[in-house]
Amino acid sequence: MMVSTAAVARVRPAQTNMVGAFNGCRSSVAFPATRKANNDLSTLPSSGGRVSCMQVWPPEGLKKFETLSYLPPLSVEDLAKEVDYLLRNDWVPCIEFSKEGFVYRENNASPGYYDGRYWTMWKLPMFGCTDASQVIAEVEEAKKAYPEYFVRIIGFDNKRQVQCISFIAYKPT
């Protein structure tokens, strides 16, 4: 077999002076064996007057709901953006409503179906929905039918069989 000199690549030997060889960790001789005890607390760092105390959330009257509840009420445009996010992730939008926006126990001391963990579904899940305006229209319809109820939108992943997002779309006044 005949090999052309133009086709043969030239091999250069590796240069050893480019990177130093790994010699392991530094020896413990470089580190002090004993430490001097520092009992002088005046040398501790201090933030001085820069500290401002945070208040706790009031336990009465200002309850928090679900995702995004720390924000002001969402506008229709904000709701549409959230629903678009839900649809981009291939989640099925569902609309639910409830008189109470919180978990409560009314019928029994032990948890059960009617203790507020499950909300009533508004119609059927919106399988095949591709437009946020369809979901917003259903929310508006639920608000008209039940103006004194909370309305929320959930995103259900039908492949994993889990609820992936849930947020309040309407709070009664």
From Swiss-Prot:
UniProt-listed GO biological process terms: photorespiration; reductive pentose-phosphate cycle
SUPFAM superfamilies for this protein: RuBisCO, small subunit
Transit peptide segment: 1-52
A GO cellular component entry from the record: chloroplast
GO function terms (MF aspect): ribulose-bisphosphate carboxylase activity
Presence of the UniProt keyword ATP-binding in the record: no
The keyword Metal-binding is annotated on this UniProt entry: no
Keyword annotations of the record: Calvin cycle, Carbon dioxide fixation, Chloroplast, Photorespiration, Photosynthesis, Plastid, Transit peptide
Triggers of expression: Accumulates to high levels when grown under continuous white light.
Intracellular or extracellular location(s): Plastid, Chloroplast
SMART domains, per database record: RuBisCO_small
Extra remark: This protein is coded by one member of a small multigene family.
Similarity remark: Belongs to the RuBisCO small chain family.
Assembly and interaction partners: Heterohexadecamer of 8 large and 8 small subunits.
The protein's role, per its UniProt record: RuBisCO catalyzes two reactions: the carboxylation of D-ribulose 1,5-bisphosphate, the primary event in carbon dioxide fixation, as well as the oxidative fragmentation of the pentose substrate. Both reactions occur simultaneously and in competition at the same active site. Although the small subunit is not catalytic it is essential for maximal activity.
Identification of the protein by name: Ribulose bisphosphate carboxylase small subunit, chloroplastic 1
Species whose genome carries this gene: Lemna gibba (Swollen duckweed)
Gene: RBCS1
